């Protein structure tokens, strides 16, 4: 399997928020993360493996300094509204554990917070608009732990 120059450009562009938003896609890197994405409710659009596309191509599409053996392009879920108060207001008055975040700018910190929130069974996480994008490659990577 080969990868075209256009595919490389598209996957590489997903390291920037504006392209993730425009295309409705994000990347997941690493064997474990790709396997988890494939078992999850997320729609995996395409999986790239180093043994199939080659090390050079993998290093071109990876956002990591040391590319992992696999990378998946995943569709952002449509049922998560990251820019509206509607999700927050629908949760008010309901019981459960909720976490509110204010201005988390470091992607690694946000990923760690999300991983720990999941472990503790937090039902929903709300973040201020100026919080780093949850689909930032470093946030996604940090959720793995």
Q: Which ranges hold each PLM region?
A:
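RNA substrate-binding interface of SAM-dependent RNA methyltransferases
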Residues: 39, 93-145
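Glycine/small-residue-rich loop that forms an oxyanion/phosphate-binding "nest" at active or ligand-binding sites
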Residues: 52-78
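Short secondary-structure boundary/capping segments
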Residues: 17-18, 61-64, 88
